[in-house]
């Protein structure tokens, strides 16, 4: 399950704005917002690119975390 808050936290820690993150992923900002808000799915290549940008070790926490109530 995608964890939007974890991705946002990783971006803040890395000092990356959403606008720059979208550019680094090769998409416009509105597409990034749709993906972050669950309107569209992340592709495998986008997840791979996020790993290159933020670090491969961040991927499990962002994309495969279990929600705890």
What are these regions (language model features)?
Residues 52-69:
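Short C-terminal boundary/hinge segments that cap the last helix of small helical domains
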Residues 6, 30-31, 42:
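Glycine-centered signal
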Residues 11, 22, 51:
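The alpha-helix within a helix-turn-helix
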Residues 28, 39-40, 66:
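The DNA-recognition helices of helix-turn-helix-type DNA-binding domains
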Residues 15-33:
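Short alpha-helical DNA-recognition segment
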Residues 39-51:
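Short, basic-rich loop-to-helix N-cap that marks the start of a DNA-contacting helix
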Residues 1-16:
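A short, Lys/Arg-rich alpha-helix, primarily the initiator
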């Amino acid at each position: 399950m995608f964890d939007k808050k974890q991705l946002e936290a990783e971006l803040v820690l890395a000092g990356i704005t959403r606008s720059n993150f979208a550019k680094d992923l090769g998409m416009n900002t509105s597409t990034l917002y749709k993906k972050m808000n669950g309107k569209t799915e992340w592709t495998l290549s986008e997840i791979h690119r996020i790993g290159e940008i933020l670090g491969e070790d961040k991927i499990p926490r962002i994309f495969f975390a279990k929600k705890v109530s």
